[in-house]
């Protein structure tokens, strides 16, 4: 069995999860495990009340967690270790320091990159970097903005968010959709299909302690808490750069993976502020985790030959996944009903053991079912090149980074979100609210991804309740022809302002696998009336 570590929509699993089969065996619960967990979660616990509230399925799962990992609960860490800066730059080191009396305790520090040729990344494009500071909580979020190559005074703006939770959006910049990738010699390689071809793109490292972001505190461990920070970042950003929005330019949020959690919540937070200084025009969610209760039905079909690729698992493994599914879904339902850490944590651990670990143990790439995991950093050795590039002193100096060491993903953040119960929560309900407010939404999915696969994404969009759900469900899937390549590049289903797109030959990171078609998708969406 090949040993490696991978993100599962961000979750770091190890090969110790090979014990998953024993989760089928009922065990007695030592009540101390709940008391210990409560202490670690920082929760007051009325044990007798809790035992009455939790159903037997959830209690059995806690018992099995204790049985499989007897030392884990006692040693459990549920907060991020502080990430301290190498050196705080003084006010005079920044071109702009932006505050707003209506947003207490927040400020934005901004620098224009004086000579982009030093970095070799889109040298003819204006670039800004900086930090959002949450002063009373000692949180500092890093961002990097690239103006449109076309007409920044008129083109729309896109905020890009990578998932994880805990992965830097600079991964999106250098690995997927930004102006350059990084070669093995640590030299930038220009990307003709960058999303800033026709839009200004902001890459934001969030939540705190991700990428070049940092905090002297433990940061956040759930999606809702992160939403306020992102909204305030945008308010201050557009205070400083009103030229990006004051002529009626559109603003969009796009992201992938765990951003299927982030984006619905962040968009809801934005729309709740009627006096905001920018207009949220649409959102785009790529290979996201949004409705686990629906999506977890589709790991076995995707792994076992029903997603368009041959099965990667033997029949007995497929049968074991089928056998464990009913219990997995029952645990997710309990999480949906209570949205309590006590129900949601065991749902995540049990279901990821039962539905995801069998595939991972094969050594295949969870982000692309056609490939083996190449080892190294998250199955793609190129990600290590990105880390090495960003850790060079001249790069950190040029972008104003205050953190000594950059890492593409912070697995502590991932763990914190899991143990806050965030993973299995029903964020698709926020999508319902957004659609009912007439916000255009594009859900796209590369069809070679396993971990947030197209089968599950199509399924949840098909059953999502909203004001035109019957009309959407009745629409036929049709071919989508990409404008740049003029080839049939996917299948699309759309009604009014809701669109689902299956992207052929794309993995988890669609812009990495099919860059021309990804840019076609974005251009057609943001410049073509929010339909494909």
Curated annotation (Swiss-Prot):
Binding residues for substrate: 452, 509
EC numbers on record: 3.4.16.5
Carbohydrate attachment residues: 124, 198, 279, 479
Posttranslational mods: Enters the endoplasmic reticulum as an inactive zymogen and is modified by four N-linked core oligosaccharides, giving rise to a precursor known as P1 (67 kDa). As P1 transits through the Golgi, extension of its core oligosaccharides leads to the Golgi-modified P2 precursor (69 kDa). P2 is sorted away from secretory proteins at or beyond a late Golgi compartment and is subsequently delivered to the vacuole via a prevacuolar endosome-like compartment. The four high mannose core N-glycans found in mature CPY are Man(11-15)GlcNAc(2) at Asn-124, Man(8-12)GlcNAc(2) at Asn-198, Man(9-14)GlcNAc(2) at Asn-279 and phosphorylated Man(12-17)GlcNAc(2) as well as Man(11-16)GlcNAc(2) at Asn-479.
Activity modulation comment: Inhibited by ZPCK.
Propeptide span(s): 21-111
GO cellular component, one term: endoplasmic reticulum
pH note: Optimum pH is 6.5. Active from pH 4.5 to pH 8.5.
Motif (Vacuolar targeting signal): 24-27
InterPro entries found in the cross-reference section: AB_hydrolase_fold, Peptidase_S10, Propeptide_carboxypepY, Ser_caboxypep_his_AS, Ser_caboxypep_ser_AS
GO molecular function, one term: serine-type carboxypeptidase activity
UniProt keyword list: Carboxypeptidase, Disulfide bond, Glycoprotein, Hydrolase, Protease, Signal, Vacuole, Zymogen
Family of this protein: Belongs to the peptidase S10 family.
Protein name (Swiss-Prot/TrEMBL): Carboxypeptidase Y
Organism: Saccharomyces cerevisiae (strain ATCC 204508 / S288c) (Baker's yeast)
Gene name of this polypeptide: PRC1
């Amino acid at each position: 069995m090949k040993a490696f570590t991978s993100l599962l929509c961000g979750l770091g699993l190890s090969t110790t999860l090979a014990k998953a089969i024993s989760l089928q065996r009922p065990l007695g619960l030592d009540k101390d495990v709940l008391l210990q967990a409560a202490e670690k979660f920082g929760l007051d616990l009325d044990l007798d009340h809790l035992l009455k509230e939790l159903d037997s399925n959830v209690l059995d799962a806690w018992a099995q967690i204790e049985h499989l990992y007897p030392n884990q609960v006692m040693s459990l860490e549920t907060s991020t270790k502080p990430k301290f800066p190498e050196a705080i730059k003084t006010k005079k080191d920044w071109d702009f320091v932006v505050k707003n009396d209506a947003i207490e305790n927040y400020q934005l520090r901004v620098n224009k990159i004086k000579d982009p040729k030093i970095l070799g990344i889109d040298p003819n494009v204006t670039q800004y970097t900086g930090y959002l500071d949450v002063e009373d909580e000692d949180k500092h979020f890093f961002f990097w903005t690239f103006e449109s190559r076309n007409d920044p005074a008129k083109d729309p703006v896109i905020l890009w968010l990578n998932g994880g939770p805990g992965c830097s959006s600079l991964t999106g910049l250098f690995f997927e959709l930004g102006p350059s990738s990084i070669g093995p010699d640590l030299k930038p390689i220009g990307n003709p299909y960058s999303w800033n071809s026709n839009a200004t793109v902001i890459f934001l490292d969030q939540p705190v302690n991700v990428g070049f972001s940092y905090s002297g505190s433990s940061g956040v461990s759930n999606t809702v808490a992160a939403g306020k920070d992102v909204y305030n970042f945008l308010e201050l950003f557009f205070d400083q750069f009103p030229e990006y929005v004051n002529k009626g330019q559109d603003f969009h949020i796009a992201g992938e993976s765990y951003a299927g959690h982030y984006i619905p919540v962040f968009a809801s937070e934005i729309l709740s502020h009627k006096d905001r200084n920018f207009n949220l025009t649409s959102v785009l969610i790529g290979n996201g985790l949004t409705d686990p209760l629906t999506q977890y039905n589709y790991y076995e079909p995707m792994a076992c030959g029903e997603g368009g690729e041959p099965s990667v698992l033997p029949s007995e493994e497929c049968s074991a996944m089928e056998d464990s599914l009913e219990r997995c879904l029952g645990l997710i339902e309990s999480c949906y009903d209570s949205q309590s850490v006590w129900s949601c944590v065991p749902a995540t651990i049990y279901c990821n053991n039962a539905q995801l670990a069998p595939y991972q143990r094969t050594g295949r790439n969870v982000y692309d079912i056609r490939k083996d995991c190449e080892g190294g950093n998250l199955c793609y050795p190129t990600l290590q090149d990105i880390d090495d590039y960003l850790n060079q002193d001249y790069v950190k100096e040029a972008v104003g980074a205050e953190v000594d060491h950059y890492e593409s993903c912070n697995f502590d953040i991932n763990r914190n979100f899991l143990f806050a119960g965030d993973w299995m929560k029903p964020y698709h309900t926020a999508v319902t609210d957004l659609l009912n407010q007439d916000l255009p939404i594009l859900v796209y999915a590369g069809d070679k991804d396993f971990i947030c696969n197209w089968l599950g994404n199509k399924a949840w969009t098909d059953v999502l309740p909203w004001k035109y759900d019957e009309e959407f469900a009745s629409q036929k899937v049709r071919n989508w022809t990409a404008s740049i390549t003029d080839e049939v590049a996917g299948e699309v289903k759309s009604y009014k302002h809701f669109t689902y797109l299956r992207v052929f030959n794309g993995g988890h990171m669609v812009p990495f696998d099919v860059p021309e078609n990804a840019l076609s998708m974005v251009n057609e969406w943001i410049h073509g009336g929010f339909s494909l």
